Amino acid sequence: HDGLVEARPKSGYFVRRPAPGSDVPLRRARLVMSPTRVAVSSGVTAVMHSMRDPAVVPLAAAVVAPELLPIRALNRILSSLAREMSTAGAGYDPPPGLRALRRQLARRSITWGLGLDEDELVTTVGAMEALHLALRATTRPGDAIAIGSPTYFGLLQLAEEMNLRVIEIPSCVGTGLDIDALEQVLSHTPVKAVLALTNFDNPLGALMSDANKERLVRLLARRDIPLI
């Protein structure tokens, strides 16, 4: 009755496209100056188990429907690579990752305006391993980190596992992390690292403007705080 669902003849029921200017503003998180410990693992585990139930629509995580992925094309590529793989594919790579891959990434970094050396790069098995390594390098158990709110639950799990305390920084759908709020927190509370998802963050999908990105970098550089 709220106009969120519409019936289409001989097709079924569908979510109605929102009318222009009908966006509902999200309630922003309350700014708390003191860091807190998080305990989310049990709840996250329950949610992940529920996603395996075919009777449950998985709205709790940003998971792509398998039918939208090019599974057949990926399988063909993997099969081709497996047939052509040398004996090197059965061994161990150095801890920073396959040198040939890091060399190609270093070459590509020129187009990013960086010009990195292959020895400056570390490849990881997904983003969460990269975040774990970055936090290990910049924090110790008990330290405080700043994270946008709302955020991806995996980041809170990671903080919990590493015994880190978290300060939530309000985020907006249109602009991302509230830099004014972050600056206010940094003026009152020692923070060892700031974890910011600046491009289409999860779950809001916010894109921080280039001007705000530059402001964020300048703010943390002045205070010598790592930006992850």
Regions found by a protein language model. Give the residues of each.
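Residue-level marker for buried hydrophobic side chains located in beta-strands
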Residues: 227-228
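N-terminal basic, amphipathic alpha-helical segments
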Residues: 1-79
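Conserved core of the PLP fold type I
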Residues: 78-224
